[in-house]
Amino acid sequence: MAMTNREKFKVLADQIKISNQLEQDILEQGELTRIDVSNKNRTWTFQISLPHFLSHEDYLLFTHAIEEEFKEIATVAIDFSIKDTNNQDEFALKYFGHCIDQTRLSPKVKGQLKQKKLIMSGNVLKVLVSNDIERNHFDKACNGSLVKAFRQCGFEIDKVVFETDSTNHDDDLASLEAHIQQEDEQSAREATEKLEKMKAEKAKQQDNNESTVEKCQIGKPIQIENIKPIESIIEEEFKVAIEGVIFDINLKELKSGRHIVELKVTDYTDSLVLKMFTRKNKDDLDHFKALSVGKWVRAQGRIEEDTFVRDLVMMMSDIEEIKKTPKQDKAEDKRVEFHLHTSMSQMDGIPNISAYVEQAAKWGHQALAVTDHNVVQAFPDAHNAAEKHGIKMIYGMEGMLVDDGVPIAYKPTDRNLKDATYVVFDVETTGLSNQYDKIIELAAVKVHNGEIIDKFERFSNPHERLSETIINLTHITDDMLTDAPEIEEVLTEFKEWVGDAIFVAHNASFDMGFIDTGYERLGFGPSTNGVIDTLELSRTINTEYGKHGLNFLAKKYGVELTQHHRAIYDTEATAYIFIKMVQQMKELGVNNHLEINKKLTNEDAYKRARPSHVTLIVQNQEGLKNLFKIVSASLVKYYYRTPRIPRSLLNEYREGILIGTACDEGELFTAVMQKDQSEVEKIAKFYDFIEVQPPALYQDLMDRELIRDNETLTQIYKRLIDAGKSANIPVIATGNAHYLYEHDAIARKILIASQPGNPLNRSTLPEAHFRTTDEMLDDFHFLGEEKAYEIVVTNTNELANKIEKVVPIKDKLFTPRMDGANEEIRELSYSNAKKLYGEDLPQIVIDRLEKELDSIIGNGFSVIYLISQRLVKKSLDDGYLVGSRGSVGSSFVATMTEITEVNPLPPHYICSHCKTSEFFDDGSVGSGFDLPDKKCPTCGNELIKEGQDIPFETFLGFKGDKVPDIDLNFSGEYQPNAHNYTKVLFGEDKVFRAGTIGTVAEKTAFGFVKGYLNDQGIHKRGAEIDRLVKGCTGVKRTTGQHPGGIIVVPDYMDIYDFTPIQFPADDQSAAWMTTHFDFHSIHDNVLKLDILGHDDPTMIRMLQDLSGIDPKTIPVDDKETMQIFSGPESLGVTEDEILCKTGTFGVPEFGTGFVRQMLEDTKPTTFSELVQISGLSHGTDVWLGNAQELIRQGICDLSSVIGCRDDIMVYLMYAGLEPSMAFKTMEFVRKGRGLTDEMVEAMKENNVPDWYLDSCRKIKYMFPKAHAAAYVLMAVRIAYFKVHHPLYYYAAYFTIRASDFDLITMIKDKTSIRNTVKDMYSRYMDLGKKEKDVLTVLEIMNEMAHRGFRLQPISLEKSQAFDFIIEGDTLIPPFISVPGLGENVAQRIVEAREEGPFLSKEDLNKKAGLSQKVIDYLDELGSLPDLPDKAQLSIFDM
């Protein structure tokens, strides 16, 4: 008997193993009505009928299970039909995102669509969009594909239409949203309960020191013989097995409780995304949670094109964790690495120092050195990592050593330059080493009295074939040298021809090296002739030139150079250049060979020296400080294209430092290539140890034929070892590591390729991974086992043992000393408190002062308060208000010492006359500013209203021992004065800007990776690009400075006790030096003042100057001012006129679209509610999805939601919780750590409502109330001027805050301006950043115009350079507001018009330097009404 459709469905459900996961009615009433099979296309289409819609998660599970089951047979498609579609309105919204993903729309369009709201009307799905442009765009893009996707899921949808959203949604939408909102809240509650349960289970597991699943294993075991490299996966396949290491994990929970798991793995041939849906009632999730980044897995599944990311991914059916033996150092005796580069080696090293230290510790190495290029910025992290892993850290640096002065004249003789005879010569050779290469051409000309009087030109036979490089460079071929004489004959003849003439050569050290080597081999000894180097001479007398190559100089001197790199042509060109240089020297007062070095060498001579690499290793604590001094001098005093270390500087500070020879760019390695052994051994005596590195690291020199072969390289090693023996210093093998593992090399290649000017771009990068002991021993096996062991193991360990334990960062805070600081802070606090509250202070004031002063004085923080007080006082004395940031307003002592205007006491009244006071400490009032006006019951005067109810604990912690972080907002234009005042307070050498380190960001790294792959013609899938991006991210790119951070060094120490110093981004013209270490590294060791710049104090100052009103006298509770936060009526305009429901355009903190929407939702009427808004808008997950929903649902109002972090502590204490528990809860919540069981229990015991607990759990970050109160206070003052003194306000706003102006629109009538704003709103999604900035200005201008004021065009006679000025009921814009016109030109126009009126546009261009584009703009603006193009010549001018 044939099976029914329902029986077929049950069989199918059993076969795909989801019977126990489907709802009972689905299992019983579901029908498999048909299967359409296409053998040609290998597709099976299942026709399935269901009684009602599946939940979206069950739908995904069901379809995925079918696809997995039949994937090896065919590609599966499923068409659903649904019998009961009455609730399809509800399910359409849930399926919407999935159906979008099934279309072929671009990812961008898909993302935009998913944000839209829906309305079901019969069988028509309406998608609400913002404007007509969006409507047309989506309508065209979807083209029926969305309907098809919905119908395939079983929806009876005939049409999808896109409609422009109106401000008033209809009842259907409201009802639907309410339903969805209710469901979301239920899901949120369930998720919270699950989270608490999971936390409890996790805690229980931790207590028992066990895990639910120790090793991931899902599905069938995977046969290792089926594994294929990821790079071989290039198309969709039914079944593939791979293995790789995880570098990213994403677990996303679905509403059903199941998860979708996404792993990114790599086998270092390529990378791949692996996906899987966890199964219901299975422990898949526990298995996946056992995985972590860095673990290896073996996975099997179907390779398919992911329509969303448009890339191949694996839909896993099976996965298992596997063990991969990590790289090990199996040597019994381990080496010590003395040459290693971290991510602090700018755009060169890859891992941070912590990764190296962890690896070295795992390998059993006893010590490790860090030697970044030119910097020591890894030291703090190195110290922390070494302490953590129990390894000895050796601190060092690879620097750039230069001689203090490079001679221009060698072996100077008493010869008059005018009368002397010169031999200008050049050699062409088989290579660059005078020790291993040979001369193939020697050419010279003899010069006397400014004329060439003789020539010498000879080839010599090297008896070896020339390399292609030399042939291409010199155009000399083997045939040309076959019959040439021996070099001995050529040099003998040349020596006789030269006589006692002075040698002249371009880069003479190279040419003379070959001459002297040749002479010595002939037994002549080195040349005794005087020498002049035209390269160094040009660098000295032509300092304005950026280049000094022969080609460049020939052009500059007008000398013909027909064939560069042929000796005779180079020689003749050099001779004619030198003849002109002799004349230049005469003009500089140099007439004798003896005078050249004396008169031409100056203090900048170090700039001419060629830097050699040198390794500096800190031996003890004194050496650390000396290294800090060396680093600082190289970055500040001797910086020229790169930090340089003059030899004299190194000698001065070498105590406690071991000096090594570094790499192939070191002085000693170069000497081995260029000088004889006696000279090499002489140079070696300057050093404390000699470095040799694996042959692979010199491969680039061999590729460039600087080292001709392995035999030559072996000779170089032996000469270096002999030099060490002669100088009695150890020779050690170093790895010059730039990354951890071989497969990390690609990241370094990408970084180097991103720097076009980097010389490493011209060569093959060597293998520079962190080598094990056995790897190093293998690298040096050619020296013999005994010698290899000596330099790799014995010598490195002996050297490490000579180095003491060094600590690069301090373990406590060192604050400046100010005599009498404790007494002054106490006296100042009480003095000002008595001025405000009277001689008989209220007990609440005394208690608060004593509590704070005990903490401040007891922990040594008085000086910090006193410094801040003096900085603020100086600013106030100079006429600029200061706004406080952060939590300093939580301190009543800060209020009484006038560091902050925020008063943290509970709300209260004070009488300025008789000092009567009344406090409200029961939580009934949010802010003192909200108290009703009241007369003093004692004397009848109007009472002052104060107090924001902020606990002190939010500033210095519950015990009051947290180092105070006082952030102050100075006027942006006054900030430099405040910074410089710290030099007056402490001394120039005691204050520095807080340094920062800028690293490669993810987006930047993505650009580097894409650029590299494109240049190399390589295509990689997205997962591999992500891996490469991760490898490049975090590498140091530059340095900078904190915008307002000033580091203060105490008078009993100097900066080098803490950190080296430098200029930000190595900008030698910067006004301030910065700390070399990132300021976070020394944050707990030295005082950091946050002297920040802000627009609000600047704007307040301008408003004060315009109006004469003292901002401190402005009433904070002015009703008309407060009204603009809920509507624009007090501005005299309507919502329709200004296209906004509030009047807060341009009001700090309340002018953005996001906050204006909050104001519309909440309609605040009090200061405390504005503080709530400020806190809510700056927090993370405090407003959206949290307080916003609570207010909308009517659960609580604006005043009772959690807005600022301090609210939690205050509320919970009023509720009855112990202060310590209230504080602890606040700290947990504000850091996004949720609530512990102990906190929940305490809150419930004190009847804290459930919504409050739920709200706490959602919060990720919270704003301090003191910060919010300070911001709001400034905002209300500025808003007061906007309401009552509008032209002053608009003039100040446009001058201080606005930056992008559309003056042509702004001078139009109010209707035109409003239409432009409205049009820009309709196109908002398509606007760029600049257009959005213009829109912000036009919103203000539209409001100003509708208030009856207008903007004039630019006036050549009246406009100022930078400030908007008032004329009647209009504003006149400044020149700086003209697009494309800079500050200098704006100032120049003002200066030029003072000399007389502009006669024409040509005159304007000539006097003020205006471009034609700017003149045309001014013309269009109507600013040049009577100005002719050119001045007319009058008879009276003749």
From Swiss-Prot:
Which InterPro entries does this entry report, sorted A to Z? Answer: DNA_pol3_alpha_NTPase_dom, DNA_pol3_finger, DNA_PolC-like_N_II, DNA_PolC-type_N_I, DnaE2/DnaE/PolC, DNAPol_HHH, DnaQ, Exonuclease_RNaseT/DNA_pol3
What GO terms in the biological process aspect are recorded for it? DNA-templated DNA replication
Q: Which reaction does it catalyse?
A: DNA(n) + a 2'-deoxyribonucleoside 5'-triphosphate = DNA(n+1) + diphosphate
Q: Which GO terms describe its cellular component?
A: cytoplasm
Does the UniProt entry include the keyword Cytoplasm?
Answer: yes
Q: Per the database record, which ranges form the Exonuclease domain?
A: 422-578
- Pfam families for the chain: DNA_pol3_a_NI, DNA_pol3_a_NII, DNA_pol3_alpha, DNA_pol3_finger, HHH_6, PHP, RNase_T
Q: Which GO terms describe its molecular function?
A: 3'-5' exonuclease activity; DNA binding; DNA-directed DNA polymerase activity
Q: Where is the signal peptide?
A: none
Q: Which UniProt keywords apply?
A: Cytoplasm, DNA replication, DNA-directed DNA polymerase, Exonuclease, Hydrolase, Nuclease, Nucleotidyltransferase, Transferase
User: Where does the UniProt annotation locate this protein?
Assistant: Cytoplasm
Function of the protein? Required for replicative DNA synthesis. This DNA polymerase also exhibits 3' to 5' exonuclease activity.
- Similarity annotation: Belongs to the DNA polymerase type-C family. PolC subfamily.
What NCBIfam families does this protein's entry cite?
A: dnaq, polC_Gram_pos, PRK00448.1
Q: Which PANTHER family match?
A: DNA POLYMERASE III POLC-TYPE, DNA POLYMERASE III SUBUNIT ALPHA
Q: Which named protein is this?
A: DNA polymerase III PolC-type
Q: Name the source organism.
A: Staphylococcus epidermidis (strain ATCC 35984 / DSM 28319 / BCRC 17069 / CCUG 31568 / BM 3577 / RP62A)
Q: Which gene encodes it?
A: polC
